[in-house]
UniProtKB/Swiss-Prot annotation:
GO terms for biological process: L-leucine biosynthetic process. The gene is leuA. It holds the Pfam family HMGL-like. One of its GO terms (molecular function) is 2-isopropylmalate synthase activity. Residues 439-558 are annotated as: Regulatory domain. Catalyzes the condensation of the acetyl group of acetyl-CoA with 3-methyl-2-oxobutanoate (2-ketoisovalerate) to form 3-carboxy-3-hydroxy-4-methylpentanoate (2-isopropylmalate). It is found in: Cytoplasm. This is 2-isopropylmalate synthase. Mg(2+) binds at D40, H244, H246, N280. Its cofactor is Mg(2+). It comes from Marinomonas sp. (strain MWYL1).
C-alpha cells in the first residue's frame, strides 16, 4: 500500500445540498422490492444457474413475497431467452408478480428482448446506459449529447415495440448506469429526456433506477444525490424512484436505507448480497432490519434456514456464518458476559406480560425466522456460568441454583480447556449427569431403594434402604423434615460429618403430573463441598436422592 494514496486516488465528489431533509426521517414503511438474483446475481456466478435451479429460485422468491423479479438478460444468451419463454408459456408467473428483463440500448438487443416477453401479462423492460465521465470518455468515447441520444433512442424503440403488444401491461425502467459518479445535472437531464420519450401514465408507468454501480462514496452522499434528484425532477407522476446499491465499500445496506429516507420507493438487490465483485445490496438484511424495528417488510423469511440452503445450492456460494440474521452464528454468544445478559433478558421477558422484545444482544427473536434458542448460547472456553446453565434450562428444564451454576461452569471450563473445542449440548448434558450423579442406572451410584416415614413427637422419622454396588444398608434417622431425617440417618450409618448448605427444588414442566428436580449441596469435614441432583415423580424421593448423590465423594468411606 502507498503511504501517500492521494498521489494515486482522488476523493469522490460530493454535492452541496444544504436543503436535505432525509437525516431527520425514520423508516416507517417498506419499499417495493425487486430481486435481481436471476439476472444480476446469476451473471456473477462462476457456474451460472441452469433452468432447474433458476425455476427453484424463482418459486422460492415468490414464496418469500417478491412481486417484482428480474429474471434474465434475454438478448445475452439463448439460455436466458429460453428461461423467459419457459416462465411465460409454462404459466409459472402468478398474476400479482411482474417479471423484469434487462437490455442495453441497441436496436437488435431491444427487439430480441421484447420478443422474449410476448404473451406476458405484465413486464418491466429495463434499459440502461452508462452516463459517468469515466465511462463516456474511456469506455464508449462519447460526449454528453451522444450519451443522452443513446438513452432516448433506446426508450423510443422500446415504446414503439411495446405498442405492438397492447395485451401486456408494460413498465419501462431506465437506469443511468454509474449514476452515483455522474454529474448530478447531467444525470437529471438524461432521465428527464427518457421520461419525456416514454411519457409515463397510469397504464404505462416508469421506473427511474438510480444505481451505485460502483460504490465510491459514503451512504449519506448518495442520499443527498437521491433527494437532490427527486426535488429537482420536473414531474414524477407515474414514476417510481428505485435504487440499485452495490457493496464495494461494504455499505450497501446503509446506502439503501438512507436512499429510502431520501425518497426512494423501490430497491433492487439480491438475497444475501450476491452480485458482481462484492455484490449487490442484501435484501434479506434490509428486510430484517425493518422487521426488527417493528415494520413488516412485506417479505417473509420465517424459514430462514431453508432460504439459506436454497441460495447456497443454487449459487454454489456459502452464506457466511456471521451474516446478519441468516448466518449460523448470527445469534450465537460464546462470551460469558454476553450469555449472562441474554439469560437474564429471557428471565425478565418471561416475568412480564409485555410482548415487546427486549433481550440484550439479540435484535430480534430467533424463533421469528425459524431458529431455535439452542443456537443462541453455545459453550466453549470463553463461556461463563450462564452458558451451560442456559442450555440445561432451555433444553432440559433445569433451573440451576447460582452455586451449582458456578460449580458446573468450572467443570465445563476444565473440559473445554482440555479439548480446545466448543462443547455441544449433548456433551454438556452428559457431563452434568456424570458430575451430579443423575444416572439412575449407574452401578457406581448409591441409590435410594425405598423409604418409609412417620411423625413422632414433632419429628419426622425415616427408615430407608440404600444400595451401593453389591452392598445394601438399612438406615434410620429423624429430623424436623424428611430431608433432615435422611441427613441424620447418613451421619449415623456412615459417620459422615455433613451438613446441607444449599437446597432448591422445582417441577419440570407445568403439568400436574410433572416430575420434580432437587438440587442439594453438602459441606463436610471429610471432603470439599459437593452437589447432587435428582429427578423423580415423587418430589420427596427426588430431594432424598439428591442428598445421597451429593455424598458421592464420601462413598469410599462407606
Amino acid at each position: 500500500m502507498l503511504t501517500q494514496p492521494s498521489i494515486k486516488y482522488r476523493p469522490a465528489q460530493i454535492i452541496d445540498f444544504p436543503a436535505r431533509t432525509w437525516p431527520s426521517k425514520q423508516l416507517k414503511t417498506p419499499p417495493r422490492w425487486c430481486s435481481t438474483d436471476l439476472r444480476d446475481g446469476n451473471q456473477a456466478l462462476a457456474n451460472p444457474m441452469d433452468h432447474v435451479k433458476k425455476m427453484a429460485f424463482f418459486k422460492h422468491l415468490i414464496e418469500c413475497g417478491f412481486k417484482e423479479i428480474e429474471v434474465a438478460f434475454p438478448a445475452a444468451s439463448q439460455t436466458d431467452f429460453d428461461f423467459v419463454r419457459l416462465l411465460i408459456e409454462g404459466k409459472h408467473i402468478p398474476d400479482d408478480v411482474t417479471i423484469q428483463v434487462m437490455t442495453q440500448s441497441r436496436v437488435d438487443l431491444i427487439e430480441r428482448t421484447i420478443q422474449s416477453l410476448v404473451g406476458a401479462k405484465k413486464a418491466i423492460v429495463h434499459i440502461y446506459n452508462a452516463t459517468a465521465p469515466v465511462f463516456r470518455e474511456i469506455v464508449f468515447c462519447q460526449d454528453k449529447p451522444a450519451t443522452l441520444e443513446l438513452a432516448v433512442q433506446g426508450v423510443k424503440h422500446i415504446r414503439q415495440l411495446c405498442e405492438q403488444y397492447p395485451d401486456t401491461q408494460w413498465t419501462l425502467q431506465y437506469s443511468p448506469e454509474t449514476f452515483c459518479f455522474t454529474e448530478p445535472d447531467f444525470a437529471l437531464e438524461v432521465c428527464e429526456a427518457a421520461a419525456k420519450t416514454w411519457q409515463p401514465s397510469l397504464e404505462r408507468p416508469m421506473i427511474l433506477n438510480l444505481p451505485t454501480t460502483v460504490e465510491v462514496n459514503t451512504p449519506n452522499v448518495f442520499a443527498d444525490q437521491i433527494e437532490h434528484f427527486i426535488t429537482s425532477f420536473s414531474s414524477l407522476e407515474n414514476i417510481t424512484i428505485s435504487v440499485h446499491p452495490h457493496n464495494d465499500r461494504g455499505t450497501g445496506v446503509a446506502t439503501a436505507e438512507m436512499a429510502i429516507l431520501a425518497g426512494a420507493q423501490r430497491v433492487e438487490g439480491c438475497l444475501f448480497g450476491n452480485g458482481e465483485r462484492t455484490g449487490n445490496v442484501d435484501l434479506v438484511t434490509l428486510a430484517m432490519n425493518l422487521y426488527s424495528q417493528g415494520v413488516y417488510p412485506n417479505l417473509d423469511f420465517s424459514d430462514m434456514r431453508r432460504t439459506v440452503e436454497l441460495v447456497e445450492e443454487c449459487n454454489e456460494l456459502p452464506v457466511h456464518p456471521r451474516h446478519p440474521y441468516a448466518g449460523a452464528l448470527a445469534f450465537t454468544a460464546f462470551s460469558g458476559s454476553h450469555q449472562d445478559a441474554i439469560k437474564k433478558g429471557f428471565a425478565s421477558q418471561k416475568s412480564t406480560s409485555s410482548m415487546i422484545w427486549q433481550i440484550p444482544y439479540l435484535p430480534l427473536d430467533p424463533k421469528d425466522i425459524g431458529c431455535t434458542y439452542e443456537e443462541v448460547i453455545r459453550v466453549n472456553s470463553q463461556s461463563g456460568k450462564s452458558g451451560a446453565a442456559w442450555l440445561l434450562q432451555e433444553n432440559h428444564g433445569l433451573f440451576l441454583p447460582r452455586k451449582l451454576q458456578i460449580d458446573f461452569s468450572k467443570k465445563v471450563k476444565n473440559h473445554t480447556d482440555q479439548t480446545g473445542h466448543e462443547m455441544p449440548l449433548a456433551d454438556v448434558w452428559r457431563l452434568f449427569r456424570e458430575s451430579y450423579r443423575l444416572n439412575p442406572d449407574d452401578k457406581g451410584q448409591m441409590k435410594l431403594m425405598d423409604y418409609r416415614s412417620h411423625s413422632s413427637n414433632g419429628l419426622q422419622e425415616i427408615r430407608a434402604t440404600l444400595r451401593y454396588q453389591e452392598k445394601t444398608w438399612q438406615l434410620v434417622g429423624e429430623g424436623k423434615g424428611l430431608l433432615s431425617a435422611m441427613l441424620d440417618a447418613l451421619r449415623k450409618r456412615f459417620n459422615w460429618q455433613i451438613n446441607i448448605s444449599d437446597f432448591h427444588e422445582h417441577t419440570l414442566g407445568q403439568q400436574t403430573k410433572s416430575k420434580a428436580v432437587s438440587y442439594v449441596q453438602i459441606e463436610s469435614d471429610q471432603a470439599t463441598p459437593s452437589f447432587g441432583v435428582a429427578i423423580d415423580e415423587d418430589s420427596t424421593k427426588a430431594s432424598l436422592q439428591a442428598l445421597i448423590n451429593a455424598c458421592h465423594p464420601l462413598y469410599k468411606e462407606a
